[in-house]
Design a protein with these regions (language model features):
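Extended ligand-binding regions for polar small-molecule ligands
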Residues: 20-93, 101, 113, 127-128, ...
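A ligand-binding cleft/hinge motif common to bilobed small-molecule-binding domains
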Residues: 1-17
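Terminal (typically C-terminal) long, contiguous, charged/leucine-rich segments with helical propensity
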Residues: 100-108, 114-123
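Histidine (H) residue identity feature
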Residues: 1, 93, 106-109, 125
Length: 138
């Protein structure tokens, strides 16, 4: 997996070159302990929320800024159905405010200045040729 290669060679400058060709795909996802359906739902919907935030251009820094032609961003992530998960209605808003959207999280942990050689590829939002998308949050 490319992320493992980037991690193993981090801090070694240009001693290694990671080629752009992909010879395999290894789908990965967050994991929770077996039979914890409640936590699985929380993790799944949290990921959907940060993916949706990236798709519509919301970042941790801009989440409180108005978007012309769209209702308040905070309202987009005011989700009454969250109570079924044991979460407050604003859980998605607070998550994005704290850690950012999917791209911000990805860049902070797998790319950006820390690992400049890691390309998002299929981890890019579907609007930019990747596979990442979220179902409707309502």
């Amino acid at each position: 997996d490319a992320s493992a290669l980037v991690t193993m060679t981090a801090g070694q400058g240009d001693a290694f070159e990671i080629l752009p060709d992909r010879i395999s795909k290894e789908p990965m996802a967050p994991a929770v302990r077996r039979a914890d359906e409640s936590l699985l739902a929380i993790v799944r919907w949290t990921i959907y929320a940060v993916i949706e935030a990236e798709e519509i251009g919301i970042t941790a820094a801009t989440i409180n800024e108005p978007v012309p032609g769209r209702r308040a961003i905070a309202d987009l992530f005011d989700l009454p159905a969250a109570s079924a998960l044991g979460l407050s209605n604003d859980w998605a808003y607070r998550t994005i405010k704290a850690v950012g959207n999917y791209g911000e999280i990805y860049d902070r942990n797998l790319a950006g200045p820390a690992m400049p050689r890691m390309q998002r590829g299929l981890n890019e939002n579907w609007t930019r040729g990747g596979l990442m998308y979220a179902p409707p949050l309502r």
